[in-house]
Amino acid sequence: MTKTIMLANPRGFCAGVDRAIAIVERAIELYGAPIYVRHEVVHNRFVVDDLRGKGAVFIEELKDVPPGSTLIYSAHGVPLSVRAEAEALGLTVFDATCPLVTKVHVEVKRMNKAGMEIIMIGHAGHPEVEGTMGQVDAGIYLVQTVDDVATLRVVNEDQLSYVSQTTLSVDETRDIIAALKARFPNIHSPKKDDICYATQNRQDAVKLLADQCDIVVVVGSPNSSNSNRLREVAALKGVDAYMVDNASLLEPEWFAGKRRVGVTAGASAPEVLVQAVIDRIKAFDVTQVTELPGVEESTVFALPPALRPLF
């Protein structure tokens, strides 16, 4: 049985990931190795291993950073306590926090200053959630599901607002927001939807892909939130959906009896991994590869001034 590979568009790296990787590479170029990075700069094993080979040292605790070293915050952002600790240690710091995550941080501080309690829609333990909730000392509560909304306790229902993790499922978040508004009619919304453009575009693209395919393969690492959401979105469309870190994890039996194979990638997965997956699937009697139409992304985020090229 001949097969066709269909590629989602857009897929792979977003502007925030491009910027975060460039910050690490540029810091190594200017300051020399080692450059310390708090947490994986983006959630992709291939990217992290590549940067480690160039001289990046990934740590979770600042106690592991020698005094006077250069430190980079990951794209997911950090709590205010980490910034204070880095300053106390006299570290040279570059911030690779995605600007769209920083926007949520600013929103949280604004809401807190206005005297509002804040509900954070997100996944417990994710570094973006920890960073966002760590922008204020108190008065912020985590909600992960619609069921959580029913048991939520707040001090003042009339002084309540919400923000979201930027990499969530658009549809799932919509349901949670609807539940919040039903229980707390006076809840304040953020000025703009917190789900980032790249998350939205990739989820829209995988829905289109799943509608035309018998199976969808998402390229992404297990700890990548947006990659996991892509697999879930595809599965909800009723097709077999798998997520793989690399081509070696593909199982031939997945493709038995499948004629149209969809491939996409999370925002932290490089195109080189996608091409390797395509090459591997081609061995399963694939006759053609086609790319679906999609949204063209032109967003570019600038590097910190000290890391920008002079010319």
Swiss-Prot record:
Molecular functions (GO terms): 4 iron, 4 sulfur cluster binding; 4-hydroxy-3-methylbut-2-enyl diphosphate reductase activity; metal ion binding
Top-level taxon in the UniProt lineage: Bacteria
Cofactor binding mode and count: Binds 1 [4Fe-4S] cluster per subunit.
Residues holding (2E)-4-hydroxy-3-methylbut-2-enyl diphosphate: 43, 76, 126, 166, 224-226, 268
Cofactor(s) needed by this chain: [4Fe-4S] cluster
Binding site for dimethylallyl diphosphate: 43, 76, 126, 224-226, 268
One GO BP annotation of this record: terpenoid biosynthetic process
EC number, UniProt record: 1.17.7.4
Chemical reaction(s) catalysed: isopentenyl diphosphate + 2 oxidized [2Fe-2S]-[ferredoxin] + H2O = (2E)-4-hydroxy-3-methylbut-2-enyl diphosphate + 2 reduced [2Fe-2S]-[ferredoxin] + 2 H(+); dimethylallyl diphosphate + 2 oxidized [2Fe-2S]-[ferredoxin] + H2O = (2E)-4-hydroxy-3-methylbut-2-enyl diphosphate + 2 reduced [2Fe-2S]-[ferredoxin] + 2 H(+)
A Pfam family of this chain: LYTB
Binding site for isopentenyl diphosphate: 43, 76, 126, 224-226, 268
Free-text function comment from the UniProt entry: Catalyzes the conversion of 1-hydroxy-2-methyl-2-(E)-butenyl 4-diphosphate (HMBPP) into a mixture of isopentenyl diphosphate (IPP) and dimethylallyl diphosphate (DMAPP). Acts in the terminal step of the DOXP/MEP pathway for isoprenoid precursor biosynthesis.
PANTHER family linked to this entry: 4-HYDROXY-3-METHYLBUT-2-ENYL DIPHOSPHATE REDUCTASE
Protein name per its UniProtKB record: 4-hydroxy-3-methylbut-2-enyl diphosphate reductase
Biological source species: Chromobacterium violaceum (strain ATCC 12472 / DSM 30191 / JCM 1249 / CCUG 213 / NBRC 12614 / NCIMB 9131 / NCTC 9757 / MK)
Lineage: Bacteria, Pseudomonadati, Pseudomonadota, Betaproteobacteria, Neisseriales
The gene coding this protein: ispH
